[in-house]
Amino acid sequence: MDPNTVSSFQDILMRMSKMQLGSSSEDLNGMITQFESLKLYRDSLGETVMRMGDLHSLQNRNGKWREQLGQKFEEIRWLIEEVRHKLKITENSFEQITFMQALQLLFEVEQEIRTFSFQLI
């Protein structure tokens, strides 16, 4: 697991949790929850790849891991759209920077998950 990605996740989550977006705070909390879920999934997939012999364990534990992988990519695409939308409507520079960094992080994580999944297939 890339230490920069871990610190980026932690930084983005901390900054998002400090934001007050008025009536959209539920949306922001949902995004934070999705980010946390995505981080956990990415970490577990990365650990599985590092153990390499663990593919059978992954398949036994979750026979539908490819379906789950597809769902995670859908979540990433949803998060990307949500972050882009928030970026368009916010005028606060702190929030704009946070959402731009969140968007970059999502693209990086999507690429990492693709790389991990190709190694497992």
From Swiss-Prot:
Q: One GO term of the cellular component aspect?
A: virion component
InterPro entries in the record:
Flu_NS2 (IPR000968)
The answer to whether UniProt assigns keyword Transport to this entry is yes
For this UniProt record, give its keywords in alphabetical order, as a comma-separated list.
Host nucleus, Host-virus interaction, Transport, Virion
As annotated in the record, motif Nuclear export signal runs over 12-21, 85-94
The transmembrane segments are none
Q: Name one GO biological process term.
A: exit of virus from host cell nucleus through nuclear pore
In the UniProt record, the signal sequence range is none
Protein location: Virion; Host nucleus
| Top-rank lineage group of the source organism | Viruses
UniProt-listed Pfam families: Flu_NS2
> Its function?
Mediates the nuclear export of encapsidated genomic RNAs (ribonucleoproteins, RNPs). Acts as an adapter between viral RNPs complexes and the nuclear export machinery of the cell. Possesses no intrinsic RNA-binding activity, but includes a C-terminal M1-binding domain. This domain is believed to allow recognition of RNPs bound to the protein M1.
Q: What assembly does the database describe for this protein?
A: Interacts with protein M1. May interact with host nucleoporin RAB/HRB and exportin XPO1/CRM1.
> Would you identify the family this protein belongs to, as annotated?
Belongs to the influenza viruses NEP family.
Q: What is this protein called?
A: Nuclear export protein
Q: Which organism is it from?
A: Influenza A virus (strain A/Singapore/1/1957 H2N2)
